[in-house]
Amino acid sequence: MSRQVVRSSKFRHVFGQPAKADQCYEDVRVSQTTWDSGFCAVNPKFVALICEASGGGAFLVLPLGKTGRVDKNAPTVCGHTAPVLDIAWCPHNDNVIASGSEDCTVMVWEIPDGGLVLPLREPVVTLEGHTKRVGIVAWHPTAQNVLLSAGCDNVIMVWDVGTGAAVLTLGPEVHPDTIYSVDWSRDGGLICTSCRDKRVRIIEPRKCTVVAEKDRPHEGTRPVRAVFVSEGKILTTGFSRMSERQVALWGTKHLEEPLSLQELDTSSGVLLPFFDPDTNIVYLCGKGDSSIRYFEITSEAPFLHYLSMFSSKESQRGMGYMPKRGLEVNKCEIARFYKLHERRCEPIAMTVPRKSDLFQEDLYPPTAGPDPALTAEEWLGGRDAGPLLISLKDGYVPPKSRELRVNRGLDTGRRRAAPEASGTPSSDAVSRLEEEMRKLQATVQELQKRLDRLEETVQAK
């Protein structure tokens, strides 16, 4: 009798653990807008989520440790005039976040350490160029201040946030229909896109050339998502002709046939893939699902190995994914998701069971740090570079906020004041606060005089 051989993997027993109630973010009004993005973005300092707003678009930004019930009057980022569709934290500055909206603009915001105390209406810079709603924003992984946006005008624009200028444009001749997803390669030299015309494309954005493309990676008519994974491969999620959800792995040099194709179920939600390059694990989260599936990618056939599935009772309206430097390494946490319910945001930790409390070097190889490897000018000049790596052995402490400087020719002073590295406010911010205090004091004095006159009138009668 033959014996079944079980593949050996240190990630076979990874399990998901939802946070306790007091570690969740309660009473948040998650956006009801229909759009296939995660609606949530997190980093080691903040959690941001797109929320319902009357008369425009807004998203909520909370310090990571500020859990519990969120006040209904909590300040939001509310500068857009139409619903926000996508948000993304800058990988090189944990205080900077970009947002794309139905108002056809991209806005870049600077969040002070400690979070917002007043509504934030003025962005650091507004990026205008799209003619229809902007549904995707994605920062370059290694070049400073390089931001990509994709709109329903079938245009991809690459911006230098430091100047507020569009430096590259991929027009409708590249994507003749709605763009479903865009993902940067690890060194930022390529992007892969999925489009409503049922094609997945690999593009060199600086040359505006399509390096490779695959027609109908999935036979179904519903949206396809595509991301770069290990060794330059691409992973796609989509639907079969019979509306079964699928996940497929492709070699970028040979897109004729998939390296692996697996059918999952018959649910209708689009699967959002999240890839961890340190562990080669990809997590699939479906909007409207109540589960997270995860697979390990290897360099040998069959390449894509199912590991397990985390399930819960309530379905998810969106999902955020924490960068590796924001995890608790002393608990063997290899991933953390932020699941959006209708009125709640729930952290879910993915953990490898280990008995030792010591640092597990095999689980935590050097990972991408917060410093950029290139300037925007170097990348535009043709250079590529992988991320600058850091060790998590001694833990990670987020640095103080760094001011985002925008130079727009004569408009060099247009930027929000932020705390400097020393933690003290800038002189401009102090001057503005002092002026506001003087105005408030004058108003109080005037009101007091009116009250005194009113009392005298009443007493005279």
Swiss-Prot record:
Cellular localization per UniProt: Cytoplasm, Cytoskeleton; Cytoplasm, Cell cortex; Cytoplasmic vesicle, Phagosome membrane
InterPro entries from the UniProt entry: Coronin, DUF1899, Trimer_CC, WD40/YVTN_repeat-like_dom_sf, WD40_repeat_CS, WD40_repeat_dom_sf, WD40_rpt
Chain intervals for the UniProt region annotation (Disordered): 403-432
Location of Phosphoserine modifications: 2, 422
Annotated SMART domains: DUF1899, DUF1900, WD40
Residues recorded with modification N6-acetyllysine: 449
N-acetylserine PTM sites in chain numbering: 2
Positions of WD repeats: 13-63, 73-110, 123-160, 164-204, 207-251, 258-296, 302-349
Cytoplasm is among the record's keywords: yes
MF terms in GO: actin filament binding
Coiled-coil intervals: 425-461
Record keywords, A-Z: Acetylation, Actin-binding, Coiled coil, Cytoplasm, Cytoplasmic vesicle, Cytoskeleton, Membrane, Phosphoprotein, Repeat, Ubl conjugation, WD repeat
Biased composition (Basic and acidic residues): 403-418
GO cellular component: cell cortex; cytoskeleton; phagocytic vesicle membrane
GO BP, one annotated term: cell migration
Assembly information from the UniProt record: Binds actin.
Similarity-based family: Belongs to the WD repeat coronin family.
Function of the protein: May be a crucial component of the cytoskeleton of highly motile cells, functioning both in the invagination of large pieces of plasma membrane, as well as in forming protrusions of the plasma membrane involved in cell locomotion.
Protein name per its UniProtKB record: Coronin-1A
Upper lineage: Eukaryota, Metazoa, Chordata, Craniata, Vertebrata
